[in-house]
Amino acid sequence: MRKTVVLAGGPVVAAMLVIFMGCSGDATKAGPVASPSGTPSTDQRDVVTTFPTEQHQPFEAPPELKSTNGLLETTFDVHPTTFNVAGAEVRGYAYQGQFMGPTLRVLPGDVVRVHLRNRLKEPTNLHSHGMYVSPIGISDNVLRVMKAGSNNEFVLHLPRDVEPGTYWYHTHLHGHVEEQVFAGLSGVLIVDGLQDRLPPQLQDVPDQVMALKDLQVKDGAIVRSNIDSNAPTTRTVNGQVDPVLTAQTNQTQLLRLANIGADIWYRLRLGGAQFHVIAEDANPVAEVWTADELVLPPGKRYDVLVRWPTPGSYALETLTYSTGPDGDNYPQRRLATFEVTGDTVPDVAWPTSLGPVSPLDTDHVDRTRNVVFSENPKTNRFYINGKQFDPTHVTFVAKLGTTEEWVIKNTAREAHPFHIHVNDFEVMAVNGKPYHARSEQDVVPLPPRGEVRIRMHFKHFVGATVFHCHILAHEDNGMMGIIDITRSGRLSKATIKSLKEMNKAMLGQHSTDMGDGAHTGHTMEMPSR
């Protein structure tokens, strides 16, 4: 995916993308990209400009909001604004005035209540990525349209058995997702409790939120249209360029690595230290595993423990990376620096397990579905089972309480990160080879011309939700489908009504064609069951 046209204005990663794709591109020095000529051009790489950034400043965590007595209540005043990114004033979109949205920190069983005031000139909405909550009403309903100028309530009732770990939130209105996330509308959401599963000696280790968030700037503003992932891009950690963190020799730290950007991938390495993965996509792992590198497509999260063996400087870098012949080629960049000094901290044994994996590999499979991701690079259109997203078309209906196996094929010559809302899944096989899952997950890359087999159980929540490619440009340009989870296994009247309301609201906000055939007057298409 090179240039995009916005319509409206874990181990499995490493196994698939290193083995089946490899990496390409020339390594470049860490730091800002050399400024292009600035000559007007239709090629985004020629019009994006770099901006002066402060580098190597002390690390700053995003602002944090914590629940009190079971409730986290806040206001998101969504508006265009000018904020500071790495020492430079940049225009973009914000939830609470900053490029980094506040970190929301809650506990299982809590209620999250957001008063969302949309002060944009376009519609928006809000999504809690990876969260096991209801997809209907004023909850995690991405089919809801929050109109320009409107005031809205967004309420999450977290189950008491929701898994602890790192989630994130972002705008999710089809046709506007890439531009709004790229402009700044994303942040981290943490469900506490992961540390409680660690050995007592590790439960109070430093807890660092490290949100990977990128931007491109032209004329002092974040680019929001004709975004080209190969154009000069500033990669930040919490909005900082190469911030400096400190640690004591042999100290253990918890790093919450989250790719909360719109389109680009990261191939992370921490020179001289290793990643000990304790949770993937906010799912505590049944077996703690160790990696020298981690690949994070858009939307991916890893909670990792890191121990600094000797004094010195350690660079967190993203290495050169290719997503395939028709995909993107990313350069090497330094993201953060860890300065390790002081007396050696005594050794502490690593944990071996933080939670069981649901035994989906032994479950009875009630239904098998074939899902095909495809694209037309010449027209910049993307498809699931031959169709672009249509708010009047339900792709699948699933019955509550059943287990399904999906065989997801990617016919494109670039990787697509598959994501589904509400229910996480377990990877069964990659390109026909059995896969040993250490946890469930909510994002998995589909290799170019490859195949991934997953299983998921629809255990509690009913309602219509979506699955899609988490390269948000691809989602906006068609690569998304709707799944209706019902008690009967038949399309619900409530879903038909809500989709018609969504379609009416979207057409009332803009007249852009949302894909092949998604126009006023369409009748509801019957889904595959």
Per-range role (PLM):
Residues 19-22:
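C-terminal motif of bacterial Sec signal peptides marking the signal peptidase cleavage site
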Residues 24-27:
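Bacterial signal peptide processing site
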Residues 370-380, 384-427, 442-462:
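C-terminal substrate/ligand-recognition segments
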